[in-house]
Amino acid sequence: MQALDRRRRGERGSAFGNFLTLLLLVGLIGLGAYLYLRPKPGADAQPAQRTSEAPPPGEHGGKTADEMPDPIEPVAGTPALEAAAPYVPKDNVLQIDISEYAGYGGLIVANGGLAPSPDSFFAKQYGFQVKISMSESETWSPLNNGRLAATATTVDALAVLGRSFDAVVPLQIGYSRGADMVVVDRGIASVNQLAGKVLAASQFNESEFFIRYLAGEAGVPVVVLRDLDASPVPGKLGLVFYEDAFVACDAYAFELGSAAPRLAGCVGWTPRTEEVVEGSDGRAKVLVSNRNLLVVADVLAVNRAFAKQNPKLVEGLVHGILEGNRLLREQPDAHLATVAKAFGWTEADARGELARVHLANLPENRAFFAGTMDSAGSFGGIFQSAVLAYGSVIKNPADPARFADTSALDALAKRNLYGDQKIAIAPIKTSTGAALEGDPLLSKDIRFFFEPNSSVLAKEEPKNLEYLDTIKRFLQVSPGSTVLLRGHVDNLRVPEFRQQGGEPLVKSMALKAMELSRQRALAVSDALKERYKDIDASRIEVVGRGWEEPAGTDSDLNRRVEVQWFTLE
């Protein structure tokens, strides 16, 4: 009661006090209105003329700092899966789970939709039906635990899951061609320039693998940060993880609107990546997509125990998806409606999404698993690239042969099915001008071993062969890409030349250094063409830079051949 009485006394007050209070309130309201309405520093008064230094209010849908997406706690190590158990079909119907992605359109066409159907390819040709479910959450555990017959995943995920994933892979469904993107601040020109920056990503999917793969090829170490309060690590690319790739891009879009963004980009997939760029007022761009970088391969994963007990059913799944892929490749207009209905898209949307995938046929599948694919990543190549990209995250890597099972593909080939099909993967070019006119996607310094003071490669040095394989992989996984070999020599003796003969001798020796560096780059080019007869010589260019661009004070590092990789976008 005593407290209540005091409050009442304070409420009454004097008339003069009330008058002063009223004046104070009016003054505060006026000041607030002035501060709100006056032009913001660094921004024009007219909304249409706002500069990138001061993003327009409400750019992020009126979201406040409290509404910014929160990072998730990163998983240490690899994902834990439920215990392995065999899948048992019910009523002769196989349960398969996919995500909303046009690359799985062949399965839908073969099934005539999502629901089990006696009119499906599977029912008519092999006597079983398929029920297709769609979820965006990972389905590795349900497959492992016997709740699914099969699911769609990517090769890189298999490397992460390792021996705990009790599945076999009998089929490549296709390649993603443009769906995965790295979006960055406008001023970032290459993957190498991501060192010391932080990107938003999602963990253990193809988007994380994509950026880890690129960073690894550029020689930029990756470090996982718990949140945006962690300081960027000099010389390393920091990754902050979000619930999924769309949320990661939401976080980057939000940060773009702040005065001091803590994110330099995001890794995700369409359409969210493109929406972020379009809404950035020119502050963001697509650094690279996988349109012509074929390292994201979708595959069918089948419960191992089920596959072992039912090889004919697995053959039916493989055959049906290949047939659906054929129909979508050869007669897309006749089957767009089926795909669109399953995903809740318009036919125009379905057509656009299908343009971002390459649906694999039988000969492409056989080359994919055999490692003879010349214009894209192979099963073993992508698997091992993922092991290298994830590094210490994968404590005990599995062998890719643990998963690959080509018996169904071999059986179809013996039946002489799809004999008219050919491997048909070509570059998709959307911009004008030669690739070498722009910035390289990344550059990689390689220290080839040469005979002393010459441009002759040391033939007995095994490292040289490994380095040649590295350059070949660049050309293999990216149709239409080119490499520029830039030779460099050491500048250690420049002071000695200057002392001996002044600037005239320095200039004379600089010309010789330029020619030696060019000859060394040519030697690498010739060795590539000799080792890999199928390489198109027009995709390799050379230049000598002499001692003009030292990597530092280390003489060994200065004697190098720099490989710049230009991809088509």
Which residues are covered by each model-predicted region?
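N-terminal hydrophobic or amphipathic helices and topogenic motifs
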Residues: 6, 11-138, 144, 361-440
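Short, glycine-/small- and polar/acidic-enriched structural segments
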Residues: 50-244, 250, 264-270, 287-291
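Second-shell loop/turn segments in exported
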Residues: 94-95, 129, 196-202, 303-308, ...
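Solvent-exposed, polar/charged alpha-helical surfaces in well-ordered, non-transmembrane soluble domains
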Residues: 105, 109, 141, 145, ...
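Pocket-lining segment of extracytoplasmic ligand-binding domains
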Residues: 155-157, 236-344
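Secondary-structure end/capping motifs
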Residues: 310-397
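Periplasmic peptidoglycan-binding/tethering modules of Gram-negative envelope proteins
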Residues: 403-484, 492-508, 534, 556, ...
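A non-catalytic structural micro-motif
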Residues: 479-488, 504-550, 559-569
